[in-house]
Amino acid sequence: MVQAFVNTVDVENGVEELTNPGQLHAALTRVGALDDGAPALTPADLRRALAVREALRALLHANVGLTPDPAALKLLDEVGSAGAFAVRFGADGSPTLAPKASGVDGALGRILAVVYSSMVAGTWSRLKACPRDVCGWVFYDRSRNSSSRWCSMSVCGNRTKMKRYRAQAVAR
């Protein structure tokens, strides 16, 4: 859910999937954060969701060793508060964290509940945002020791290493 939501923009190619409230509604429904019959979203909802998406990307950068922006963390705190969470128990008795809010606050709250649950489960550190400044693509690190840094070593990893090599060569 988190990966699909954050990857609704291709930073490198400048392709934005969420350009209007209807597209936001469709995307949040597709990732399971918004119920199918939820009311239409507004331009303000779109602005809030885009800000949260980038705050999540900043949080995911921490999983590759970068420090998240304090403003991004503050926004995520505000969204978490707006979600007003409750513990819900499924038919099998397993607990889940669910927002009491509806609309965009509820949808963004569901996404944050997934973040929280994956942190508690110990799987959050495997979801990462590519640290290459023009990329930021979110990927799941499937390496044995969770050491992947780039969304693609053959693309972003090589480009970054080549850029560093050239800078060192010029400095010599």
Model-flagged regions — what are they?
Residues 1-129, 136:
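Short helix-coil boundary/hinge micro-motifs
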Residues 110-164, 170-172:
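BZIP DNA-binding basic region
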